[in-house]
């Protein structure tokens, strides 16, 4: 299941610790003897001095996005830390990151050969693969073509412009009814619990062409798998940074492999069913689209890579995981901000009421006519920065950036949180202010401001599902804003402190929601 590996290290056993200590001592001495020579005219990377055994792990701490942002103020936009045996270059600053990922994209498009990455889709994941050509390039092109084809699929009735709009609209309307029912029964609801099930249902519809009841065990199993995956990976895998540990027994790694195997088995079953019922003239979902593109060989003309059933399973796995946790986290944060800023929530409703009205369901074509809602989404992405880092990059060759030499195969962290909270880029970055993304008269989104915000990565490894993800968040939120007014629980302060993990989530809490009157002004 594809999610994001973050720069953290979990707990280790006594035996792991002893082996690691010996290994690190030897490695430290070897590295001291065989330092990479810096080419003339380039500078050595700055950064905090690492300890011989653990590197800079203590300084990185439990909230790397904050500690590495603080380090960037001291060492600059390009600096180096050491985690275990692995040197890591940390990039901050919008211009520096754009220079690396776009202007020097080929040099920074790699993925580090982390031990964990090898077991995600057998090392051939779209998101985590260390390969930059051949299989990875063909698989990425295939996935992009399938997504593009799916985006043009018609809905089952004329009221929907496309299949995506139909899936999201129906699920969002059902979510409104569910929250109303839960409120009548319990008087409060857990926003993340209900949103995550709804988003899982949408991604099941998109990938597999099926929708579940919210209490269906198969759907809940998927949600639980994702939660288990997040808990296991968020703790970090020491073997990623201390390679000798991969040869020792690891309970965490066993859980990690088991979760991936269970999800792969589920996807394999559905892909097999799709092959049995596939009809080229009736493409139902993304899996059908992948099968269709494989059969038509719509790949790079220069690529001889053959796409097997197993590869389709892997791509579906990638797309499901990438579109699940990210979107559910974004929507959950959006609801929290609605509650935290009731005046903004009312302004969003007024825009919705004046533009769409109370009787028609919002649709994707309404997006340009709802600039404040779009600005609210952008500010939610920026302020929460729920994806504080991209998936780690890696240099594909010896290169330089801002005058500093960076050797080939160096692991690179991109600090998206720092970019989204950079005082040189944003006025009063700690304040939540959607208006920062609007033009002077508030009638449309300022595209230049919107492009400054970073959440989906950049360059050759940018998220291929970004357009669909943005559309899904917009439509879900539009329907929620039109139909519900969200409140905090009386006497319970809202805690917006993020909890660091695969994606940064808010603390679980209970909220209240009330149906809007259809003629409400």
UniProtKB/Swiss-Prot annotation:
Its cofactor is heme. Substrate binds at residue 229. Its EC number is 1.14.14.1. It is found in: Endoplasmic reticulum membrane; Microsome membrane. It is a peripheral membrane protein. Keywords: Endoplasmic reticulum, Heme, Iron, Membrane, Metal-binding, Microsome, Monooxygenase, Oxidoreductase. Heme binds at residue 463. Pfam families: p450 (PF00067). It comes from the Eukaryota. Its main location: endoplasmic reticulum. It is an enzyme of class 1 (oxidoreductase). SUPFAM superfamilies: Cytochrome P450. One of its GO terms (molecular function) is iron ion binding. One of its GO terms (biological process) is progesterone metabolic process. GO terms for cellular component: endoplasmic reticulum membrane. InterPro entries: Cyt_P450, Cyt_P450_CS, Cyt_P450_E_grp-I, Cyt_P450_E_grp-I_CYP1, Cyt_P450_sf. Belongs to the cytochrome P450 family. Cytochromes P450 are a group of heme-thiolate monooxygenases. They oxidize a variety of structurally unrelated compounds, including steroids, fatty acids, and xenobiotics. This is Cytochrome P450 1A1. It comes from Stenotomus chrysops.
């Amino acid at each position: 299941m594809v999610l994001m590996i973050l720069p953290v290290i979990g707990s280790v056993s006594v035996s792991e610790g002893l082996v690691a200590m010996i290994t690190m001592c030897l490695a430290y001495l070897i590295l001291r003897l065989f330092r990479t020579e810096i080419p003339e005219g380039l500078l050595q990377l700055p950064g905090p001095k690492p300890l011989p055994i653990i590197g800079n792990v203590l300084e990185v701490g439990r909230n790397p996005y904050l500690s590495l942002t603080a380090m960037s103020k001291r060492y600059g936009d390009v600096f180096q830390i050491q985690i275990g045996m692995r040197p890591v270059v940390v990039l901050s600053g919008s211009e520096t990151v754009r220079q690396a990922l776009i202007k020097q994209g080929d040099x920074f498009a790699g993925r580090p050969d982390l031990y964990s990455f090898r077991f995600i889709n057998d090392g051939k994941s779209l998101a985590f693969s260390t390969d930059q050509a051949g299989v990875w390039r063909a698989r990425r092109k295939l996935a992009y073509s399938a997504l593009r084809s799916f985006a043009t699929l018609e809905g089952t009735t004329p009221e929907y412009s496309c299949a995506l709009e139909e899936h999201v609209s129906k699920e969002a309307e059902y979510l409104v009814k569910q929250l109303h029912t839960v409120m009548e029964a319990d008087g409060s609801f857990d926003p993340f619990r209900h949103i995550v099930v709804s988003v899982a249902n949408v991604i099941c519809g998109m990938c597999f062409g099926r929708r579940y009841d919210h209490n269906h065990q198969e759907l809940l199993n998927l949600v639980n798998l994702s939660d288990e995956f997040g808990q296991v990976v968020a703790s970090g895998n020491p073997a990623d940074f201390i390679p000798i540990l991969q040869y020792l027994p690891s309970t965490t790694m066993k859980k990690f492999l088991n979760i991936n195997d269970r999800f792969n088995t589920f996807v394999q079953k559905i892909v097999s069913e799709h092959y049995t019922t596939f009809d080229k003239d009736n493409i139902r979902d993304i899996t059908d689209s992948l099968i269709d593109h494989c059969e038509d060989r719509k790949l790079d003309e220069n690529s001889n890579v053959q796409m097997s059933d197993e590869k389709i399973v892997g791509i579906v796995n990638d797309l499901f995981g990438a579109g699940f946790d990210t979107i559910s986290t974004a929507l959950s944060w959006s609801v929290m901000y609605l509650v935290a800023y009731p005046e903004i929530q009312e302004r969003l409703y007024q825009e919705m009421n004046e533009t769409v009205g109370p009787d028609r369901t919002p649709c994707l074509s309404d997006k340009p006519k709802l600039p404040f809602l779009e600005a609210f989404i952008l500010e939610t992405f920026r302020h929460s920065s729920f994806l504080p880092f991209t998936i780690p990059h890696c240099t594909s060759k010896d290169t330089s950036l801002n005058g500093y030499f960076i050797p080939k195969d160096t692991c690179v962290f991109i600090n998206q949180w720092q970019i989204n909270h950079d005082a040189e880029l944003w006025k009063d970055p700690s304040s939540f202010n959607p208006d920062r993304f609007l033009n002077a008269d508030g009638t449309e989104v300022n595209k230049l401001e919107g492009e400054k915000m970073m959440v989906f990565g950049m360059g050759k490894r940018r998220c291929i599902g970004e357009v669909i993800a943005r559309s899904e968040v917009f439509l879900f939120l539009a329907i929620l804003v039109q139909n519900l007014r969200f409140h905090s629980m009386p006497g319970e302060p809202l805690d917006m402190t993020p909890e660091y993990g695969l994606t940064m989530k808010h603390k679980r809490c209970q909220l209240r929601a009330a149906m809007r009157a259809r003629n409400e002004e």
